[in-house]
Amino acid sequence: MKKIVYYIAVAFLAINFSSCSDFLDLPSKSKTDSESVFSSIDKAEMAVLACYTGVWMQDAWYKAQNGTDEMWSTESNSNANNYAANYVLNDQSCPTGIYTTSYSSIERCNSCLKGLRAMSLSGEDERKCHIYIAECLAVRATCFLNLIRYFGDVPYSTVPVLDMTTFSSSRVDRDEIYDGIIADLQEAVEVLPWYSEGFFSTPERISKNAAYGLLARTALYAAGYALHWDLNTYDKSTLQMRRPLDESRVRKLYTIADEACKAVISKGENSLLSKYEDVFRALNEGGVYNPEEVMFEYAEFGNTTNGRVGYTNGLCIHASNALYGKTLPLQLIHPTFYLSFADDDTRRDVTVGNYSIDAAGNDIAVPYGALNLGKWRCNWKAGPRTATLKTDVNWPILRYSDVLLMYAEAENYLNNGPTEAAKAAYEQVRLRAFAGDASRIGTTPSTYDTFFKAIVKERAFELATEGWRRTDLIRWNLLAETLAETKAN
């Protein structure tokens, strides 16, 4: 009897230990290694969403945007935040936030692409997988474009760090990178759904519409001027400000941009809002989307990605204002830029804030030397901020008006003068600016040079303070000339 009890006890203990072992061997629900993440399409989607964090960042609209004909920084030259704006060359002038954030997202894209391509799926899950792959290609291309815009020739990798044969990399010729990311975007536009298909619920993710616009933008930058040098020697004497040496390459790139814009325009899904102000009121209010015009916007929400949009680059609001909360603008509009707008251009008083707000909520006029950036206004928000420095204001990375102006620019180049389609695209942007009154938009230029100069001006008026002016001027080889003119005025 004792032996029977003993055997039962031993068996019971064995079962318990076995159960305990099985319990301890249960997979972790929070495990985030590649095998776990890419075990289902829903988990894989979460990984893809994480890739978007590096497509835009504060350094892009602050440190790297100042110092043009549009705006300037109020910080002193002894402050590292202002070095890039004032073209002070030292180790601290580099806006490292762009570099580290972009490469972080690129690594996530590379890891996702490897994981997604290894998944074995069928039906709707397989379709989703292909779309997520296209998303990652488009996000990675966007990150590399930002790196090239600010740093020129940079390290270029399309595989995860764990798969690299070396952890060090020299600079790669930007033309090689451009070829790679243009090919990625061309692959992406074939797979991504149009926004109207409803696959994406907000323009915070890249639809086919947005991918075409990003492709056009990338092609125009690839065709533009840039500072090239010998990447074998890094000899400063080899520095040249030039376009790609092969004119046929330049023409091919303009053709890519032209056709990408044409694809968006001919689809007919996108349009301009009737009022310019409504674009930015919606962005400031939060949770209001206008995908017909704002084709791709950077989501600013939560404790990890939320930025200072409107705090650092908006209206000046008194610290004691209880309704809107304090702001501390460190960027101001040049008086010359404000005065360059036509008086009846409705974009002027949206782009430029010619008042501040006192503690009681009253508007106080400011002098020309203290003109604020007007597109980002905390008094346009629908509710309170997440915190003083967290405003929940999304950033417009791509708008339809940009697509129209890129199309006009490409058509002008390819035809040695503006086509009727180029003029129509240009005039569509102008008409909205002047409240639909065709008699106020002026005569549209008809020669290559005059139309190009009109595009240069119109992009300044339409896209001011949205992060493109400085690098637009570089790709046109107009930065030095424009800065000299601004300083003289």
What positions do the PLM features span?
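Bacterial N-terminal signal peptides that target proteins for export
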Residues: M1-I8
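Bacterial Sec-dependent N-terminal signal peptides
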Residues: I4, L13-S40, I181, A216, ...
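Membrane-proximal, proline-rich intrinsically disordered regions
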Residues: C20-N66, S237-T238, F280
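Conserved, well-structured interaction surfaces
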Residues: S40-M57, S78-F151, T165-S201, L373-W395, ...
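Elongated scaffold/linker segments in the mid-to-C-terminal portions of large proteins
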Residues: D42-K43, V48, Y52, W56, ...
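Short, surface-exposed recognition loops and adjoining beta-strand edges that mediate ligand/DNA contacts
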Residues: W61-T74, P193-A210, G224-L315, G436-T450, ...
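Short coil/turn linking the two alpha-helices of tandem helical-hairpin repeats
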Residues: I148-Y150, P155, S196, Y221-D230, ...
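TPR/Sel1-like alpha-solenoid repeat signature
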Residues: Y212-T218
